[in-house]
């Protein structure tokens, strides 16, 4: 029912934007925003680009860094405007060292829960080889890159008794014209409760936290965000929880599984199109 209401509202809005001659007024956002979802199995990396600008959220495992760098260069990006590391688990920070050594990075945002691991050590060593001072996000941070607005929401505690790394995940909202996307890292129960309490509103796309693992608070998160698409990073060996998939079906949310191949999610500021290699994509009405 909510999706039908969205479609109706969108139709009304678009009708209101038409001139007497039947032509639409100016676009909600100039150009396009693209989210490239790497297919790294149970590891996360998302490249968000607008015209001439690039932001990377997480870097997958150590062996994924080379592929990220290669993709950036193939697409003509010699620098990153910002690197956001949601937390320091190896499947999120692993490729960061390679990225920092190979690509000019202007800004690094990180979580507040460091880990004693070789991946963390390599990341810090690579960071020392640059002139960047990484920012540990402790307050809500909003900034604009190109025509996209990014808001980063930090964990609300300095430490968590259970799953401290995952529950320290940064959450990032990306807004472009009338479209919006929410990335939640590996948030588990304690962090999910915090994100839900923020009452962030609706999003066109929600990244399901922690590779699609089940948590009762996913019900609250989905009903708050009311997405049309839900993105999950998992693997054939460790697939998403069936209870999570059943919930998405129940809420009429289309699941996008990165393990089935890389995804490109493109917004023109009003509609969103999702495609895999060889696909043309299907337009999606923006959230109301």
PLM feature segments, named:
Residues 11-15:
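Repetitive helical segments and hydrophobic/amphipathic motifs
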Residues 2-3, 7, 17-288:
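Non-globular, low-confidence helical/coil segments that flank catalytic cores
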């Amino acid at each position: 029912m909510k999706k039908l209401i969205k479609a109706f509202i969108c139709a009304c809005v678009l009708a209101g934007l038409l001139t007497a001659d039947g032509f639409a007024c100016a676009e909600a956002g100039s150009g396009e925003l693209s989210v490239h979802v790497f297919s790294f199995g149970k590891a996360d990396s998302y490249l968000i680009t607008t015209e001439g600008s690039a932001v990377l959220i997480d870097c997958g495992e150590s062996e994924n860094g080379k592929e990220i760098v290669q993709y950036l260069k193939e697409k003509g990006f010699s620098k990153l405007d910002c690197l956001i590391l949601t937390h320091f688990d190896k499947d999120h920070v692993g490729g960061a060292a390679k990225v920092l050594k190979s690509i000019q990075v202007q800004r690094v945002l990180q979580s507040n829960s460091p880990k004693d691991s070789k991946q963390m050590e390599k990341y810090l060593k690579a960071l020392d080889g640059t002139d960047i001072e990484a920012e540990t996000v402790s307050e809500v941070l909003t900034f604009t890159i190109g025509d996209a607005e990014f808001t980063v929401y930090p964990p609300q505690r300095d430490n968590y008794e259970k799953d401290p790394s995952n529950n320290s995940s940064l959450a990032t909202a990306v807004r472009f014209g009338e479209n919006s996307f929410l990335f939640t890292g590996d948030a588990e129960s304690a962090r999910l409760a915090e994100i839900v309490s923020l009452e962030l509103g609706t999003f066109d796309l929600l990244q399901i936290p922690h590779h699609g693992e089940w948590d009762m608070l996913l019900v609250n998160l989905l009903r708050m965000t009311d997405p049309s698409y839900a993105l999950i990073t998992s693997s054939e060996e460790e697939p998403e929880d069936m209870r999570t998939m059943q919930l998405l079906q129940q809420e009429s949310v289309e699941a996008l599984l990165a393990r089935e191949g890389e995804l490109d999610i493109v917004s023109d500021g009003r509609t969103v199109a999702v495609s895999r290699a060889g696909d043309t994509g299907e337009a999606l009405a923006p959230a109301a």
